[in-house]
Each structure stands twice: as C-alpha cells, then as structure tokens.
Amino acid sequence: MPRIAVIFESSPFDRKGLFNAVHNRIKGLLGTGECWVDAYCIHSRDNAFTRAVRHTPYAPVVDSVEIEGITYRMLWYRFSILDHLLVEKFGKRPCLFRRFVKTYVKYLDGYDYVIAHSFTGALFAYEAKQLYGIPYFASWHGSDVHTHPWRVQVIREDTQKVMEAAECNFFVSKALMKSAGKITLNARKEVLYNGVGEEFVKFDKAGVAKAREQFGIAPGEKVGAFAGNLSAVKNVLVLPPIFKTVSEQFSEPIHFIIAGDGKLRSQLEDELSSATHISFLGNVEAEEMPALMNCVDVLVLPSLNEGLPLVCAEALKCGANVVGSDVGGIAEVIGHHNVVPHGPDFVPQFAKKVVAMLEARNDSDDFAGQQALQQLPPEISWAKTTARELSFLA
C-alpha cells in the first residue's frame, strides 16, 4: 500500500474552495482503502499589523486540526514583510520562506509519493524530490496559474521549474491547462476535475422553507446571489449595476444575497447602501453552504479569472441555476450558453441572462424542470476524480 503525503497551503479555519477541494480529494483516496495518506497544511502566521494590512482572519496556532476524521498537520511560517518586498517590489526570491521550506521538507522523507496542491505545496514537493528522490504530482486550481506567475517573473520561473519536474500536473479545467501552456510546454499535463461534496443536495419543500427563514428571505421572493471572495479578480464591483438592472427588468420581488468577505466589502456596502432587499452575510460556515444554496434561484459569478469554480457546481446540485462570465472553467461547469464575455456590454448582457433564467424557472417550477435548464456535467464527480487520480499512482 503506497504512503502518500498531500501538502498544500490553505486554511482549515476558513474553509473555502481550495481547502474543500483538497479535503475531498483526500477523503476519496482514503475511501478506496488502497493507499495511506497523511495531510500537511501550510499556513502563514500574522501579527496584528500584518493581519490588518493583508485582511487575513485570525487563525489559532495549533499543531494539527482534525476534520471528518482527517488530521491536518500544520506547518506554520511567519509572514515576512522582508520577503514580501523582495518578491513584490524587487522581483527576487524570498529568503526567509526558502529557509522555512528547507527546514520542514524533512517531514516528507519516507513517503512513496507526494501530491502537492498550490504553488507553495509544489515547492515543498520539488525540494523533497531533489533531496529524497520522491516522485510528486502537482495539482493546480486557478490563481497559481492564471494570476500569480504573471505578477512576478521569479514566480513564473519557479512555477515552470516545479511543473517540469512533476510526474504529472493536474489542472481543474481545460481552460486552466491551456493557460499553463504559456508557462511551459515541457511538462506532462492532464485535466482532473474536482467534484461536489455529498452534502450539496436539493432539500425538500420543508427544508427549503426552513433555510429561507434562516437567511431572512420573505415568502414569494426570488433570490439572486453571489458567493465568494469580495476581491478584484472576482469582479464584484459589477454586482451593484447587475443587481439594479435585474431589479428593473424582472417583474417579481427579488432578494440579493452577497456571501463572503474581502478587501472590497466596504466599497460594495457603500455602493449598495440605498438598495433594498440586499443581504451581506459575510463568511458563511462551510456547513451552512448547502442551506444557502437551496435558497438561491440564480447564482452569479462575473469573475475576471477562474480555475474551476466549485461554487457553481454546488449551486447546480442544490437546484439553483448559474450565470457567469466567459473565463476559465466557468463554461465547463454551467454550459457555454450561460456565460457572458467581458466587454463594453457585459453588465446589460449579464443581467439579461439572469432575468431570462429567472423567468425560465417560473415556467419550470420543480427540481426536475430546473435541472433541465442546466445540468452538472457527469465528469465533475469525486468518484471519477478519485479513480483517475489513483490510476496515476499504480
């Protein structure tokens, strides 16, 4: 039975897309009974000043965290302003973080394989291969391909290095794999979709009514929603004009929900301060997301860049419909007819699709009819992902 180390940078204290994807990948591998898996989670330590500057939530410094029977050994590094300046201002490699990698890579010694998620995880895996000869697989989820390598040349160079040294690189969408071709053509690449957790299911009528009451939605109101980081890459500043246009063009009462937090939250709240029927929920606990998705009629995702947005797949599994921008892997989840290309008419065209989807739901007011409007592609399945990932380890 092979011994596998899974290593990645994320937060078990604020579980969102990347963490949930890795967690479900680990669950899938363990569930086969065909391998032993240990999980290592890399996490930065901020003081009060750097936390305020970076808008990072407080995280308790603990040795390990257990979630659903999986123990994550925490590898802590202190966020360094010196390293930040070296990379972001001077285009140099960080010195303190490199020391952190060389100090803690010893934990990977003795494994048969390393599976790395995120650029930081891949750096550890690369170092383990150089020191101990351990083969590794690197999974790429989005910004570590389409954004960060293009900010700073040394990040692009190191991304190329770790991609080319991997046994195989897995990308969560065809679009992301295509984007990686701009980084290197000399690495093995495969698409390996993420799946959707079993907890994301369509509730019965009583369950939906309870969820709507929980989130303060009045009877008879339709629900439009955004869920994600309130950041520039998510293009959240177009939400106010989209919501306004939808409200003007859709004849029924509609309640808009914004779930998430981030640097642009205050600006969004200011721009929507005079609007009615708007709810800012902040960060929603992972356990509450299925209930929220069961309240949603149409989820909107106007991002400037994406890998494979699991929030779209989760919404579809709960009976919502989704309209998104034509970037990354969004169309691979929700269908090419349900995305809007960025351009001068983005807001009116996006709002038009949202209104059309709301009206179509009125004509298909049951789960089967709503699913017929949009179906989750069958390849977005944890069972298929696990089987395929395991086949590479055979």
Can you name each region flagged by the protein language model?
Residues 5, 217-234, 240-244:
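Conserved donor-binding/catalytic core segment of Leloir-type glycosyltransferases
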Residues 116-121:
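Short His-centered aromatic/hydrophobic patch
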Residues 175, 195:
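Carbohydrate-associated surface elements
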Residues 268-284:
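Nucleotide-activated donor-binding/catalytic signature segment of Leloir-type glycosyltransferases, i.e.
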Residues 283-284, 291-296:
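Short alpha-helical donor nucleotide-sugar binding micro-motif in glycosyltransferases
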Residues 304:
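Aromatic "clamp/platform" in nucleotide-sugar-dependent glycosyltransferases that forms part
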Residues 321-324:
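Short hydrophobic beta-strand element within catalytic cores of glycosyltransferases
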